[in-house]
Amino acid sequence: MAQSAERPRPYAFMTANATRPVRTRFAPSPTGFLHLGGARTALFSWAFARHHQGVFVLRIEDTDVERSTPEAVQAILDSMDWLGMQPDEGPFYQMKRMDRYAEVLAGMLEAGTAYHCYCSPEEVDAMREAARAKGLKPRYDGTWRPEPGKTLPPVPADRKPVIRFRNPIDGATSWNDMVKGPISFDNGELDDLIIARPDGTPTYNFCVVVDDWDMGITHVLRGDDHVNNTPRQINILRALGATLPEYGHVPMILGPDGEKLSKRHGAVNVMEYDAQGYLPEAMINYLARLGWSHGDDELFTREQLVEWFDTRHLSKSASQWDPKKLNWVNAHYIKGMDDAELAGRVAPRVERRGGKPQAADLPAIMGLLKDRAETLEQLAEDAMLFCGEYQPAPAELAAQHLTETARAALADFAARARDTEWNRAAISALIKAVLADRGLKMPQLGIPLRVAVTGRAQTPAVDAVLELLGKETVLARLQAL
């Protein structure tokens, strides 16, 4: 395989498919949850389709019956929905297309572009070992491949055949990859691929080809672990007389340590990020920047991503997952969100903690807390100060801060507060008056106020906290000292 150092511009696909409406697809296998790499691939395919006013297709490749589960399918659909990447068509399920695959297989057998092979797995293994011993690439030797003047072995009576694709022997299969540039494989290096198993079920590479053909897919963006599949799929499409899609292969995502991203680096399941309190807007932004760029722009809306998306700006190099950068992006979106909308997203998380968001002014609470929060979970936890059941300060904390001097100042504050208008400015003025009259510094009243009213020594600005708790609650807690 050879790759060029430079990508030609303009790309071949910009003219080759100029008259074909853009149709992209995302085709996950439901053998597990949608992981970050898959989500990024889906995002690039979705953004490309949206940029070109095209169609984004969702296809579920569920032919691995033993490993595919309904739960995994639902998790994929939930993840796509959460990220706001709803397909224009689909989801389509490969298991519901078996009759179509059988029809195409029969046509290929009749046309001579596929053939039955009766070699046992052990015989094929022996062929490959023999090739290795000669220093050759291990491959099937074409024993059952029909050729003019060739006599095929007798058909074993007790063995069901596989179906192999009759791959071209001469020449090369080349394409101008949308990400990597020109790529070429010698056809002589490619096996006659098995496209149906002995029980008749079609294999992955065959199903993909038929699906892309039937669904009119014009552009395939996928992980670069599929590069070796591409020449095989191109040759099958050519044998079917199909118009080829354009292919682009994006590099993998690496963990912070430079190794392949895995569970040991933290969450890899997309919906775990929802549970941890990340906004889908932030995930879209961050995932897009993992392998794609628009100048120096780090932050952009979904609409800007669609407007700016260009495969020429996809990186050829692997990207590195950075949890701190994700937190920074998420914090940006939290700070910029309307308080009422943010409250709506945080309220269910408060309720799961046993809090009562409806009993407090949650939008105002969000306005107070959001500038220091990185996740919705952090916001929900901090909001429990206002929405949760009051827990008096631990004895040790109370003994440290609720001294006789502090209690006298708190009693003075409470007495004056009864006739004070309850807003942040008035509360701030009241605190300053008590400090001035008693010759105290801010920590000598501010910390005791926090401890007495919230049970904590550290909170956001004390005047803002007291305002949101309400005069009745504040006075009741001070009275209980």
Curated annotation (Swiss-Prot):
UniProt biased composition (Basic and acidic residues): 139-148
Residues that, per the record, bind ATP: K263
SUPFAM superfamilies: An anticodon-binding domain of class I aminoacyl-tRNA synthetases, Nucleotidylyl transferase
EC number(s) per entry: 6.1.1.17
Residue interval(s) of motif 'KMSKS' region: 260-264
Compartments in which it is found: Cytoplasm
InterPro entries, per database record: aa-tRNA-synth_I_cd-bd, aa-tRNA-synth_I_codon-bd_sub2, aa-tRNA-synth_I_CS, aa_tRNA-synth_I_cd-bd_sf, Glu-tRNA-ligase_bac/mito, Glu/Gln-tRNA-synth, Glu/Gln-tRNA-synth_Ib_cat-dom, GluQ/Sye
GO cellular component: cytosol
Residue ranges of the region described as Disordered: 139-159
GO molecular function: ATP binding; glutamate-tRNA ligase activity; tRNA binding; zinc ion binding
Keyword annotations: Aminoacyl-tRNA synthetase, ATP-binding, Cytoplasm, Ligase, Nucleotide-binding, Protein biosynthesis
GO terms of biological process kind: glutamyl-tRNA aminoacylation
Pfam families cross-referenced by the UniProt entry: Anticodon_2 (PF19269), tRNA-synt_1c (PF00749)
Self-association state and partner proteins as the record states: Monomer.
HAMAP family, per the entry: Glu_tRNA_synth_type1 (MF_00022)
Protein function: Catalyzes the attachment of glutamate to tRNA(Glu) in a two-step reaction: glutamate is first activated by ATP to form Glu-AMP and then transferred to the acceptor end of tRNA(Glu).
Record-stated family: Belongs to the class-I aminoacyl-tRNA synthetase family. Glutamate--tRNA ligase type 1 subfamily.
NCBIfam families membership: gltX_bact
Protein name: Glutamate--tRNA ligase
Lineage of the species this protein comes from: Bacteria, Pseudomonadati, Pseudomonadota, Betaproteobacteria, Burkholderiales
